């Protein structure tokens, strides 16, 4: 997605060989026009999948998930990382290791909002080692719902998360795939098209 790649190049900051800071438009401050375009792109890519619900994780996945849900006409449920006084019982639970924060979080979804009749699109901001996506998949599977695919805003293709998910037969659609963050420079995976002769 060209507009997203341009935003990453212009406003993203490489903090190390494996950390990209995008708090200017995605993780802290949110660019609603960009989020709207991201939502439209996810909806376009998954429009034939009969999505009934979008599942994401708090907090950075919420904006792109809501925009995609608006386009698809479905609801969003986000996995919580912290216990809530209003959500104590009747929860699906999974443990997720955060690459960025270097900690394990227990995530949960209420059983009241997802069931075996749902066809779910999982959306998240980043895909690195795949732990958040695997945790969200576990919650969806516990509910007996089916997974239509996973939409990722930014995939770090140099880490193994995307490979692990795809090897499990999961459809993963990433809007920007980063090949490298070496030397403080963002390099995108080049989508090569085969020429028919």
From Swiss-Prot:
Localization terms from the record: Cytoplasm
Amino acids binding 5-phospho-alpha-D-ribose 1-diphosphate: 128-132
InterPro entries: PRibTrfase_dom (IPR000836), PRTase-like (IPR029057), Pur/Pyrimidine_PRTase (IPR050118), Xanthine_PRibTrfase (IPR010079)
GO cellular component entries: cytoplasm
Superkingdom assignment: Bacteria
A family per Pfam: Pribosyltran
Annotated positions binding xanthine: 20, 27, 156
Keywords, alphabetical: Cytoplasm, Glycosyltransferase, Purine salvage, Transferase
Reaction equations catalysed: XMP + diphosphate = xanthine + 5-phospho-alpha-D-ribose 1-diphosphate
Aminoacyl-tRNA synthetase listed as a keyword: no
GO MF terms, alphabetically ordered: xanthine phosphoribosyltransferase activity
Subunit structure: Homodimer.
Family, per entry: Belongs to the purine/pyrimidine phosphoribosyltransferase family. Xpt subfamily.
Name recorded for this polypeptide: Xanthine phosphoribosyltransferase
